[in-house]
């Protein structure tokens, strides 16, 4: 019984996402869900993929990357271009989407590997600067390529997949992303990755190939960022490089930090909340006030950092820590049983 409970607990995120997918699929097939709702579901799925993939680097590897939007940009433009090229022969079919996802993800992973080889020898602020620069370079290069290739400053016009089923594909890819990341992190390789985060020098002394593991994590993270970009291109009529600036990388980072570093479930929850918040802010902050949206995320990030590091808040953090609250509740229940 305990083993079954632990199995359910360890796979709770799969169960919840699968249940959500089945519920909204039935709602969609019966015509009880509108297009605005499916658009929101698509955005949530993309945000979860981006947050959990960046969480591998920031939360489990312990390295700060600010170029996640750059890898997403690669996937978005390649996915859109491949879809445009295949549309005359395959149409807007699952085959077209499948090919676009594979190619977009693999090319983003290759760029992640190329950038990772020299960059991952750096640490902390230096790595953050390099990845931030990479994201801006990708965005600028794509924007200045000939219009016939990726649309130039006007952006790349993309074909639209069947809107009724895109959110289903998106959540299937979410499950694939979670399965890949969680299986890796629960294996011996995941323990090696965590040891690098905790103490890189000690990990090296134990014979762990630090560079190899860093490169593997960075490459997998880039792969799923590319997939997120491909999905994004299918939700837009035109992909523009301005959508992938450093502000978007910061927004993804806020999801990871808000959910808790090293917590996949936390990243899922935070990505969902931030996406809903985005939709609300876009309706509330219009015109000149739209710039305040990025300021809002900066304030959230600052408050989280202060909360996690301020010595004066340590008693409060320990008192209301979720693990401590659960442990205290279990202790109270055990005490009650002993009294009875």
Q: Which stretches of residues belong to each language-model region?
A:
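Transmembrane alpha-helices and adjacent helix-loop boundaries
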Residues: 1-340
């Amino acid at each position: 019984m305990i083993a079954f409970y632990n199995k359910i607990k360890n796979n709770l995120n799969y169960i919840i996402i699968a249940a959500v997918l089945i519920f909204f699929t039935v709602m969609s097939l019966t015509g009880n869900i509108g297009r605005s709702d499916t658009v929101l579901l698509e955005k949530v799925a993309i945000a979860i993929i981006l947050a959990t993939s960046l969480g591998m680097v920031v939360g489990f590897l312990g390295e700060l990357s600010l170029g996640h939007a750059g890898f997403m940009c690669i996937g978005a433009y390649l996915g859109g271009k491949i879809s445009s090229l295949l549309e005359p022969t395959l149409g807007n079919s699952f085959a077209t989407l499948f090919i676009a996802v594979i190619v977009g993800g693999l090319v983003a992973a290759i760029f992640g590997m190329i950038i990772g080889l020299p960059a991952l020898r750096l640490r902390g602020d230096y790595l953050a600067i390099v990845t931030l620069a990479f994201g801006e370079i990708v965005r600028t290069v794509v924007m200045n390529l000939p219009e016939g290739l990726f649309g130039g400053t006007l952006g790349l016009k993309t074909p639209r997949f069947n809107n009724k089923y895109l959110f289903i594909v998106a959540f299937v890819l979410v499950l694939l992303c979670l399965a890949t990341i969680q299986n890796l992190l629960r294996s011996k390789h995941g323990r090696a990755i965590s040891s690098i985060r905790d103490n890189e020098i000690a990990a090296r002394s134990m014979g762990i190939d630090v560079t190899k593991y860093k490169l593997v994590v960075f490459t997998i993270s880039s792969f799923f960022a590319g997939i997120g970009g491909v999905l994004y291109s299918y939700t837009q009529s035109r992909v523009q490089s301005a959508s992938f600036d450093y502000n978007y990388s910061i927004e993804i980072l806020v999801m990871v930090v808000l959910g808790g570093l090293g917590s996949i479930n936390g990243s899922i929850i935070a990505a969902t909340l931030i996406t809903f918040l985005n939709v609300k802010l876009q309706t509330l902050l219009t015109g000149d006030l739209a710039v305040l949206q990025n300021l809002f995320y900066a304030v959230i990030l600052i408050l989280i950092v202060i909360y996690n590091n301020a010595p004066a808040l340590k008693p409060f953090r320990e008192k209301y820590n979720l693990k401590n609250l659960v442990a205290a509740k279990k202790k109270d229940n055990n005490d009650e049983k002993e009294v009875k």
